[in-house]
C-alpha cells in the first residue's frame, strides 16, 4: 500500500530513521549517509532560519556540485522554503541580476556582505554550535524549486514550480529502481540533474555526483558504484562514444539498466550507436522544460520504429503543432510546439522575469519547432529563434550540427545565421575539432548528410567547448559576438 505523500524534509528524516547508515550521496572521494544528510540539514536549517530564511521564501544556492549542495537544499525544504539554484561560476553581473530578480531571503555560497545587507553564507559554511541536529517541525515547501532559465535566451528568468515539495519515499519515478544508484553528472543548477538526483535520494537511493563531466570518469563511476540509472545530455553521450573502443570496453557497466538522454535532441546516428552498444531497452530520451507544462518520453525500442522522435506526451499532458497563424499543422509539417498540462494553463509554474507565450485558450509554447507523425510521436526541428532563413528556405541549425558532429574529429560545434546581402542570411559553423580539418573536408563530409543549401558558407575554428556543462548552446550570444566583428557579408 503506498505511503501518504510527505514533505521532502520529512522524507529525508523518514529514510534516515529506517536505514541510517545507507549512503544517500557520493561525490569524489566523499560520501554522505542518510543519517548524516538528516542531521546536517537540521543544523543548516536552524542556521538559515537565524539569518531570516522562513517558510515561503526563496533561498538562492550558488554552490558547486557536491554533497554540500544537496545538504543545503534539504535544509531549505525543512524550513518550508524553496531552493533556487544558480551556477557557482556565474559572472558577478549575471549572478547579481538573478539575485535581484529572485529577492531571496538568503544566498548560500557567497561571502557575507556580497549583496549589501542581504544575508548570505559562504561555501564551506559551518553552523554555529548552538544550532543542534534534533528533528525539526514538519513543514511543506509550497514551491518545490525555482530553477534559473537554461540561458539560451541570454536573459535571466526564474521558473517557480507551483507543485509543493512532497513525495512518496517508497515510489521511484522515471524507471528508477527503488533504492537504486543513479549517476547525475550534470550541473545541479539545471533542472534535469537536480530533479534526477533528488528523485533518487528521496526514494531511498544513492545519487552519484560529478564536479564536472568526464567521459572516462563517468564510466569508472558506473562500474565502481554499480550505477543502474544515468542521466546524460547528448554532448556527454558523444564524448563517451568518442572514447577509443578499447577504453570503453575496460569498464563493466552491466549494472546500467537505463540511460536517460535529455537537454537537447540526440542526433539519430548517436542514438543508434548507443542502442547498438547497450541495447534498445536501456536507451531512453525525454523532452520537456523546467516549466513542466508537458513532456514526452521514448524508449529505444519505440525509437527504432520512429527514428528521430522524442516520443509521445506523458500522462494526461497534451501537445499540438500550430503554424504562424495559430492553425493546427497537418501531420509531418513543422510548426511551433504548444503544450497543455492536466490542470490547465498556470497550474505547474510561474515566471519571474518573463511572460508565458500562450494562445487565447491557454496552450503554451517554449519556442520549440517540431512536427507529429501519424502515431502521435513528436519530432523536434529546433528553437524558433534559432531557425535560419537562407534564400527563403528554412534551415534548422540543430540538423546541421548533428551532421557535423557525425564526423569523428568534431568534438563540438554551433551553427548560426549571419546577415548576407544576397541570401538574407548565411550559415556560419563554429567548430571545435580534435585534429586539423580543412573547410573543404568538412563540406565534403556534410554533402553526405545534407542538401547543398544547408551546408555552411563559412567555418570558424575554436579550441574551447561551445556547450556548457548541461549541454546548452547560447547561439544568440555567439551570433551577437560575430555580428560585432564581421557585419554583413559583402556582395
Regions inferred by a protein language model and the residue ranges of each:
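Conserved beta-loop-beta connector loops within the AMP-binding
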Residues: 318-338, 371-375, 435-439, 473-474
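Conserved AMP-binding A3 loop
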Residues: 33-35, 141-167
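Gly/Ser/Thr-rich phosphate-binding loop
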Residues: 202, 228-229, 245-306, 318
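AMP-binding/adenylate-forming catalytic core of the ANL superfamily
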Residues: 46, 230, 367-454, 466, ...
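Conserved AMP-binding/adenylate-forming core of the ANL superfamily
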Residues: 21-52, 60-66, 91, 95-96
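Conserved AMP-binding/adenylation subdomain of ANL enzymes
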Residues: 167-181, 189-229, 243
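Conserved pre-ATP/AMP-binding loop-to-beta segment of ANL
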Residues: 3-5, 20-21, 125-126, 130-148, ...
Amino acid at each position: 500500500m503506498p505511503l501518504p505523500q510527505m514533505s521532502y524534509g520529512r522524507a529525508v528524516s523518514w529514510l534516515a530513521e529506517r536505514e541510517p547508515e545507507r549512503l544517500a550521496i557520493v561525490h569524489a572521494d566523499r560520501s554522505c549517509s542518510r543519517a548524516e544528510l538528516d542531521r546536517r540539514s537540521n543544523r543548516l536549517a536552524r542556521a538559515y532560519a537565524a539569518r531570516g530564511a522562513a517558510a515561503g521564501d526563496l533561498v538562492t544556492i550558488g554552490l558547486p556540485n557536491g554533497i554540500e549542495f544537496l545538504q543545503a537544499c534539504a535544509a531549505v525544504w525543512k524550513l518550508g522554503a524553496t531552493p533556487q539554484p544558480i551556477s557557482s561560476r556565474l559572472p558577478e553581473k549575471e549572478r547579481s541580476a538573478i539575485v535581484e530578480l529572485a529577492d531571496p531571503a538568503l544566498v548560500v555560497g557567497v561571502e557575507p556582505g556580497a549583496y549589501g545587507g542581504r544575508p548570505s553564507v559562504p561555501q564551506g559554511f559551518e553552523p554555529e554550535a548552538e544550532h543542534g541536529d534534533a528533528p525539526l517541525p514538519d513543514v511543506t515547501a509550497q514551491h518545490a524549486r525555482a530553477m534559473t532559465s537554461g540561458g539560451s535566451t541570454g536573459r535571466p528568468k526564474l521558473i517557480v514550480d507551483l507543485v509543493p515539495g512532497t513525495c512518496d519515499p517508497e515510489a521511484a519515478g522515471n524507471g528508477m529502481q527503488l533504492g537504486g544508484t543513479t549517476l547525475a553528472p550534470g550541473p545541479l543548477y539545471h533542472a534535469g540533474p537536480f530533479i534526477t538526483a533528488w528523485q533518487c535520494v528521496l526514494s531511498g537511493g544513492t545519487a552519484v555526483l560529478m564536479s564536472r563531466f568526464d567521459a572516462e570518469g563517468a564510466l569508472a563511476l558506473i562500474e565502481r558504484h554499480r550505477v543502474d540509472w544515468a542521466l546524460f545530455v547528448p554532448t556527454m553521450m558523444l564524448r563517451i562514444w568518442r572514447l577509443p573502443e578499447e577504453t570503453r570496453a575496460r569498464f563493466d557497466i552491466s549494472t546500467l539498466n537505463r540511460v536517460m538522454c535529455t537537454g537537447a535532441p540526440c542526433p539519430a546516428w548517436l542514438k543508434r550507436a548507443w542502442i547498438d552498444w547497450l541495447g534498445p531497452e536501456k536507451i531512453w530520451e525525454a523532452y520537456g522544460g523546467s516549466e513542466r507544462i508537458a513532456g514526452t518520453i521514448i524508449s529505444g525500442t519505440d525509437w527504432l520504429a520512429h527514428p528521430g522522435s522524442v516520443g509521445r506526451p506523458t500522462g494526461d499532458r497534451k501537445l499540438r503543432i500550430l503554424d504562424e497563424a495559430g492553425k493546427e499543422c497537418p501531420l509531418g509539417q513543422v510548426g511551433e510546439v504548444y503544450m497543455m498540462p492536466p490542470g490547465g494553463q498556470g497550474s505547474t509554474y510561474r515566471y519571474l522575469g518573463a511572460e508565458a507565450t500562450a494562445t487565447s485558450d491557454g496552450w503554451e509554447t517554449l519556442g520549440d519547432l517540431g512536427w507529429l507523425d501519424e502515431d502521435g510521436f513528436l519530432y523536434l526541428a529546433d528553437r524558433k529563434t534559432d531557425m535560419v532563413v537562407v534564400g527563403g528556405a528554412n534551415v534548422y541549425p540543430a540538423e546541421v550540427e548533428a551532421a557535423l558532429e557525425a564526423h569523428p574529429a568534431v568534438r563540438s560545434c554551433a551553427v548560426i545565421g549571419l546577415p548576407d546581402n544576397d541570401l538574407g542570411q548565411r550559415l556560419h559553423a563554429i567548430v571545435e575539432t580534435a585534429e586539423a580539418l580543412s573547410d573543404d573536408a568538412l563540406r565534403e563530409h556534410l554533402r553526405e548528410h545534407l542538401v547543398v543549401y544547408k551546408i555552411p558558407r563559412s567555418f570558424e575554428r575554436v579550441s574551447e567547448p561551445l556547450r556548457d556543462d548541461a549541454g546548452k548552446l547560447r547561439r544568440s550570444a555567439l551570433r551577437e559576438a560575430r555580428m560585432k566583428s564581421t557585419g554583413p557579408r559583402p556582395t
